[in-house]
Amino acid sequence: MQNSTCQAVGECRVPEHAVLPQPLYREVVQFIESLPQKEGHLVTVLHKAQSVFGYLPIEVQQFVADHMEVPLAQVYGVVSFYTFFTMVPKGKYPISVCMGTACFVKGADKVVHAFKEQLKIDIGDVTPDGRFSIDTLRCVGGCALAPIVMVGEKVYGNVTPGQVKKILAEY
């Protein structure tokens, strides 16, 4: 096992990858090995890793760095830069409320408040049972349906605070 402390810049290592199920790591390795070359595919590999694990904790970032033969700092830089990557687990049913201009003007902030009240969590949090998480996003491109809520891949248009309970009941 490698050191879990930093001796010099670029030498930080985390403990062995024991937190998450090993078959998931094998799936990521197989994906990396299927690439014609590693160079230039870090974002693609991170997307795959996030789809496999659901998020990108430091253990997964280190694993990707090791297998892509790049520094952990480079992986972390990419993960922390792009908003579509997350380092914290999401709920089984992630809720995203569009806060783009059209959605905001039509009451998206009130819809967010209704979800927060119903679930008793704040933006970025996960319910204690792991079922739901709430986040906001910028413009999903369906302005005619504002305000828009996404639960996983399912899109709800013209959502009002009064519909929040009904939406949650579907899950």
Curated annotation (Swiss-Prot):
GO molecular function: 2 iron, 2 sulfur cluster binding; hydrogen dehydrogenase (NADP+) activity; metal ion binding
InterPro entries documented for this protein: NADP_DH_HndA-like, NuoE-like, NuoE_dom, NuoE_N, Thioredoxin-like_sf
Gene3D superfamilies per the UniProt record, alphabetical: Glutaredoxin (3.40.30.10), NADH-quinone oxidoreductase subunit E (1.10.10.1590)
pH dependence: Optimum pH is 8.
Cofactor binding note from Swiss-Prot or TrEMBL: Binds 1 [2Fe-2S] cluster.
Swiss-Prot/TrEMBL cofactor(s): [2Fe-2S] cluster
Residues annotated for [2Fe-2S] cluster binding in this entry: 98, 103, 139, 143
Keywords: 2Fe-2S, Iron, Iron-sulfur, Metal-binding, NADP, Oxidoreductase
Top EC category: oxidoreductase
Protein activity control: Inhibited by oxygen.
EC number: 1.12.1.3
Reaction(s) catalysed (UniProt annotation): H2 + NADP(+) = NADPH + H(+)
Quaternary organization: Heterotetramer composed of HndA, HndB, HndC and HndD subunits. HndA and HndB could form a heterodimeric intermediate in the electron transfer between the active site of hydrogenase subunit HndD and the NADP reduction site of the reducing subunit HndC.
Task of the protein: Catalyzes the reduction of NADP in the presence of molecular H(2) to yield NADPH.
Family statement drawn from the similarity comment of this UniProt entry: Belongs to the complex I 24 kDa subunit family.
The protein, known as: NADP-reducing hydrogenase subunit HndA
Organism: Solidesulfovibrio fructosivorans
Gene (name only): hndA
